Amino acid sequence: MKKKVLRITTVPVSLDLLLKGQLKMLNEMYEVVAVSSPGKELEEVGKREGVRTVAVRMERRISPIQDLKSLFALVRLIRKEKPWMVHTLTPKAGLLGMLAAWICRVPVRMHMFTGLVFPTSTGLKRKLLMATDRLTCACATFINPEGEGVKNDLMRFGITRKELHIVGNGNINGIDMSYFDRTEEVMRKAENIREKGCVTFCFVGRIVGDKGMNELARAFKQLEADFPACRLLLVGDFEEKLDPVLPETKRMLLENSRITFAGWQNDIRPYLAASDVFVFPSYREGFPNVVLQAGAMGLPCIVTDINGCNEIICHGVNGLIIPSHDESALLKAMKFMLTDEHARMEMAGKSRELIGSRYERSFLWNEIRKTYQSLE
């Protein structure tokens, strides 16, 4: 009989996008049950991955009453399912899932830490976030930071004294290099997006403050004033509730004719293929998939010196690393990429090979399998 594993995320889109294919792979060796908040994505995950799904409502934000309800629901579920392992991803699922698994004395309790919020928070919020992360670690038997930066922060801030395990070279699910490639179909679609005769900078993600969008808007305004033959392609949507951009930033982005909005896209490959440089001035990450994807598509990247980004990008090799929150450094890096075509093309030529050699999906999946087997 296969051992049972509960994989828990706060919202189903995390199962759908971050763990694509992984649940199906693990289900060949274990009985995998996917648990998350209700939603059409949860149903889609069940069909695509061939796993059973269970809906348990969880809130991403701090919500004491709902959090207690979610905890009790998870305890009931775990007592019913009697899993060998509970493996959580995302902060709230980690806190509630690890606590419920500890209450039920599940033998293996694994949590993966991705982007940490507390290092960039202040005051009471920071103390509360650190306390919840400490509780998550206290309940877990196996703690898996997504990368070296996350591992260092967990140690530096004294979140836990337990051993921390990075699987492979880091990342949640690795990258499918055969999918993120400049195929004929992708390049045909890219031709309809590309603007000839200019250098296109591309950003993919939520258009919010902590992705560095305020700095990017101001830097591009200055860049475009000096070098009209440039373009900014934004693939993502504004968010009005969680960390919206400044009103003047939104106005700047919407009114500039050299900025193109593509909105949210299920397939970002044509947009990356139609671009020359990927720019990602985020304040905090765990191990950003989008930087891996841009690199796999052969783009040099401008990233900030934060967790994950500074592991994926080697400065001057496959991109440039700049300080976060630094508009002038961002402008300087964008100017360099725009004016030095030789350096830009040289970095582009090394991007795909570097990403594939360290983060190819089949390699990471094999490391995940070995990790699970070592815990049996």
Language-model segments: residues:
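Short hydrophobic beta-strand element within catalytic cores of glycosyltransferases
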Residues: 291, 300-303, 313
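Aromatic "clamp/platform" in nucleotide-sugar-dependent glycosyltransferases that forms part
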Residues: 264, 283
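A conserved mid-protein helix/loop that constitutes part of the nucleotide-sugar donor-binding site
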Residues: 16-21, 199, 203-222, 328
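Short His-centered aromatic/hydrophobic patch
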Residues: 88-94
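Short, structured helix-loop element that forms part of the nucleotide-activated donor/catalytic region
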Residues: 43-47, 231-258, 262, 343
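Conserved acidic donor-binding segment of nucleotide-sugar-dependent glycosyltransferases
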Residues: 315-316, 320-327, 336-342
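Donor nucleotide-sugar binding/catalytic pocket of nucleotide-sugar-dependent glycosyltransferases
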Residues: 54-55, 134-186
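A short, well-ordered alpha-helix in the C-terminal region of glycosyltransferases
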Residues: 329, 336, 343-358, 364-370
